[in-house]
């Protein structure tokens, strides 16, 4: 009983103490904070644009919180969306050391997608409210059209870009390789591009010229002599020859191709069979037995099915010395994939693969599920067109066009074949023509209006090259349609500097045999090749 009295006494003392201490606490209500006016995604050009955020912060007790309110502190941080560290082993970077409400800071980050974090702290209660948003940082070389040019009379190799920063923002950038270690080379020939989902090599980008071919870092475009294709992809570097044409053979594998193939300016062909451990280019394959010396020269073209996902396992070359088509095919025996073989004629076929003519041009398309077009010329200067279907086992003679009603076709050296319609485009001087192969009718493309001092330097359709087009980061109908637009590269020979090049994009009307200009960019050198740098 005595213990109960003691407990009751202590409880009373404590209760009195609480009443006495009543004025020592702040019973202010907690404020609810809402954050508005922050976009879901901010897209910027790295080391050029600023990351700008102007949020609206509202307190349920104080109303809208303004810049300089001493009761609140603001924090902005950034981290990689894919994870990993930013700098000095830290996961986050503080974008706003001054703790101000509004953010305006240079986007000094590598091209990638990041998560931005904005936090509001009520310093009176210590309660913090936050929200996140994406920050997509692009570089001039991150995504867009790689425009390979020859600059000036010396034809210095120069890479320009049409950078796709966003759907609404497309910006030309010029001579992007000059500060990135690219050597001084002359006579550009083309761009080799092999996107794939393998960790090694990942996306492959080659700039090809008559003085050397160099691989570019897939993110930064940096390069040096160690990235010379002879040092990267060849077991034994070839002698005095340079890779000038590069292509891949794709089947239905969504991760990688079956093989990479190339041709040098010496007329030698090489095969890199990707299923082989330590795959690399070996000895020339334009020979009768693996490892032996070449016995003929091949033209600088490689015909494959461009269907995606891939549907073939073969490629077609052209033997310039013996005027015949030669075949490469994926197989189960390594040595058979290191030799080209004559393509056998089938009884009753539309044409023979031993043509007795010179090859003028060859192009790979998606038309008819993988048709390769070849323009051939006989000794009398007359031209015809063969269509070889390369789907499946390939080498199917599918079409042949003779006696073309095509003005100046015999003078043309620049061509492009459409992948949706039976159309051939060709250029002579500053004129572009559309030839309908189905009706043997030619239409001058008057909507492609070039001046008297302008000449066409390139015609092309940029077919996307991902192993699976479903991997592309942009699945919009508009973006997919871009690959069927005619690209027209032209040059003004009267330009006061070396920047007289233009690149126009023309959607093709398959009903009215016509084209219309969608966009045009200028300031380039003499355009040789254009390839879209795709992203997954």
Locate predicted features:
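Acidic/polar, low-complexity intrinsically disordered N-terminal segments immediately downstream
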Residues: 19-175, 472, 476-483, 495-536
């Amino acid at each position: 009983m005595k213990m109960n009295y003691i407990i009751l006494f202590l409880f009373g003392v404590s209760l009195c103490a609480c009443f006495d201490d009543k004025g020592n606490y702040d019973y202010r209500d907690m404020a609810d904070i809402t954050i508005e006016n922050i976009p879901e995604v901010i897209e910027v050009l790295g080391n050029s644009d600023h990351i700008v955020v102007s949020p609206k912060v509202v307190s349920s007790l104080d109303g809208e919180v303004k810049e300089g309110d001493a009761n609140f502190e603001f924090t902005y941080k950034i981290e990689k969306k894919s994870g990993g560290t930013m700098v000095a082993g830290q996961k986050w970077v503080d974008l706003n050391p001054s703790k101000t409400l509004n953010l305006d800071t240079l986007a000094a980050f590598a091209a990638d997608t990041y998560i931005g974090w904005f936090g509001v702290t009520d310093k009176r209660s210590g309660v913090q409210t936050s929200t996140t948003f994406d920050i997509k940082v692009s570089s001039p070389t991150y995504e867009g059209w790689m425009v390979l040019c020859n600059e000036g009379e010396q034809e210095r190799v120069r890479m320009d870009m049409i950078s796709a920063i966003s759907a609404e923002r497309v910006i030309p950038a010029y001579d992007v390789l000059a500060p990135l270690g690219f050597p001084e080379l002359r006579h550009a020939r083309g761009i080799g591009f092999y996107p794939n989902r393998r960790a090694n090599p990942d996306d492959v980008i080659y700039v090809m010229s008559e003085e050397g071919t160099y691989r570019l870092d897939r993110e930064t475009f940096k390069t040096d002599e160690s990235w010379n294709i002879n040092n990267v992809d060849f077991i034994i570097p070839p002698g005095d020859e340079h890779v000038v044409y590069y292509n891949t053979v794709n089947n239905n594998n969504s991760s990688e191709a079956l093989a990479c193939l190339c041709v040098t300016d010496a007329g030698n062909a090489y095969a890199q069979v990707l299923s082989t451990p330590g795959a690399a280019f070996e000895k020339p394959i334009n020979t009768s037995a693996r490892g032996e010396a070449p016995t003929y020269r091949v033209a600088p073209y490689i015909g494959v099915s461009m269907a995606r996902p891939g549907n073939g396992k073969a490629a077609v070359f052209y033997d310039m010395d013996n005027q015949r088509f030669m075949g490469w095919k994926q197989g189960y025996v390594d040595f058979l994939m290191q030799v080209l073989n004559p393509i056998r004629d089938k009884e009753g076929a539309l044409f023979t693969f031993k043509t007795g003519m010179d090859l003028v041009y060859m192009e790979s398309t998606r038309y008819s599920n993988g048709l390769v077009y070849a323009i051939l010329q006989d000794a009398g200067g007359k031209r015809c067109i063969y269509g070889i279907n390369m789907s499946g086992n390939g080498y199917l003679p599918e079409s042949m066009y003779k006696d073309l009603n095509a003005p100046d076709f015999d003078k043309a050296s620049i061509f492009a074949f459409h992948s949706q319609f039976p159309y051939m485009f060709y250029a002579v001087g500053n004129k572009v023509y559309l030839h309908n192969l189905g009706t043997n009718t030619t239409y001058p493309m008057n909507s492609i209006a070039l001046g008297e001092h302008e000449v066409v330097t390139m015609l092309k359709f940029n077919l996307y090259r991902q192993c699976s087009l479903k991997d592309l980061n942009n699945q919009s109908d508009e973006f997919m349609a871009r690959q069927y637009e005619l690209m027209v590269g032209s040059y003004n020979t009267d330009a006061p500097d070396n920047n007289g090049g233009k690149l126009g994009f023309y959607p093709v009307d398959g009903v009215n045999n016509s084209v219309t200009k969608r966009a045009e960019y200028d300031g380039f050198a003499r355009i040789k090749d254009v390839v879209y740098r795709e992203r997954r």
